[in-house]
Amino acid sequence: MDFGSYPFVTSSNTVCAGVCTGLGVAPNRIGEVFGIFKAYCTRVGSGPFPTELFDETGERLCDIGHEFGAVTGRRRRCGWLDMVALKYSIMVNGVTQLIMMKSDVMNDFDTIRVATAYEIGGRTTSEFPYEITGDLRPVYTCLLYTSPSPRDPKTS
């Protein structure tokens, strides 16, 4: 309940410090803090999702990335990578190393959009807001994706 977009949060403490508390390990005993993130964003259930895609691109991300609940089979909501939210998560968790997963999903896209800021009430900010309202609009940077597919035997 401490971080995220209230009331769409969990009562669990999901930050790195919560792991220390749960395991009974002193925070000063932790060396590196690895932040693992997807090359795109997903969300389960309701709640604000600034970069959510409601079009064919969102469907493709979901299908290619196999974004379905393991137990329920429920389709996850998919959207472009949100660097504002990622930066906030890095700060809150004290991340020292980043690991990106599911980058291979991007192989099927020529252009990738990344949210680098938000426009809220006519003002642009790269800070994560305490409250996400319908007035928020992501500001995107477009990237051309030219990396070869790791599934291509000629590149292995």
Whereabouts are the PLM-identified features?
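Acidic catalytic cores of enzymes that act on phosphate-bearing nucleotides/polynucleotides
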Residues: 1-14
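A glycine- and small/hydrophobic-rich beta-loop-beta segment
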Residues: 22-120, 125-132, 142
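Active-site loop-to-helix "anion-binding N-cap" substructures in soluble metabolic enzymes
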Residues: 3-5, 19-22
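Conserved small/polar residues in nucleotide/adenosyl-binding loops
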Residues: 145-150
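A translation/RNA-centric and nucleic-acid-associated enzymatic feature enriched
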Residues: 14-17, 81
